[in-house]
Design a protein with these regions (language model features):
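Eukaryotic scaffold repeat domains enriched in small/polar residues
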Residues: 1-217
Length: 217
């Protein structure tokens, strides 16, 4: 099964035949992430240009979409960069350039907005009966020093957005973080992060004494 297709004339492969069309249920424009729920439904963060989240059933049939226009109004997005799902089927979208996480039900109806965790580049939810939401607060290296100081933060939250912890600082040493582009939540005490500026992945083991780190280069 394939969802979406880039026209051969785009991205330097030949002259453009026509301007980029408005969002279509089966045509993406630089999608950034994908997740499936327990029923096999597929959710796509159609990220860099279409600014929407889309739902398909397990056979790939279109079901629903968020608004699909760039903006700051509830339900609008500006670069939905990461997407994850909880046990109840709620969808969490890292609305990166708006500095917030938007939460939708399984039908992509907006339920909540969390705008207190910086610029979320990546989100994930731990497995198990009591789930936690993790979100990276990341910014590129060329930003001003005051912003760079928080490129290593990762927030740990209850699913209602309550922050229960925060760890990490900007840097390229072990245990420091540099523009976390992706997170995998293996469990509530162990996460994997991919850092695009430091060119590495780290495994962080969380505990009362703070995160312990191993990395792969």
């Amino acid at each position: 099964m394939i969802l979406g297709r880039r026209h051969e004339s785009l991205e330097g492969l030949g002259p453009a035949i026509a301007p980029t069309p408005p969002p279509h249920p089966y045509a993406f424009n630089r999608p950034s992430d994908v997740v499936t729920d327990a029923q096999g439904n597929i959710f796509v963060a159609d990220g860099y240009n279409n600014n929407r989240a889309i739902k398909y059933d397990k056979a790939g049939r279109f079901v629903a979409s968020t608004i699909g226009t760039r903006g700051r109004e509830p339900g609008q997005m500006h670069l939905p960069h990461s997407i994850t799902v909880d046990n109840a089927g709620n969808i969490y979208v890292a609305d990166r350039n708006n500095g917030r996480i938007q939460v939708f039900n399984s039908d992509l109806v907006l339920r909540a907005i969390y705008d207190h965790v910086g610029a979320p580049w990546a989100v994930c939810i731990s497995p198990g009966p009591h789930q936690y939401l993790y979100s990276s607060n990341s910014n590129p290296d060329q930003n001003v020093a005051a912003v760079n100081a928080v490129t290593g933060e990762i927030f740990k939250m209850e699913l209602d957005g309550t922050v229960v912890g925060k760890f990490g600082k900007s840097g390229k040493r072990l245990g420091e973080l540099s523009t976390v582009h992706d997170i995998d939540c293996r469990n509530e005490s162990e996460i994997l992060v991919g850092e695009i500026v430091a060119w590495r992945a780290q495994k962080l083991t969380l505990g009362a004494a703070g995160p312990r780190t191993s990395n792969t280069k």
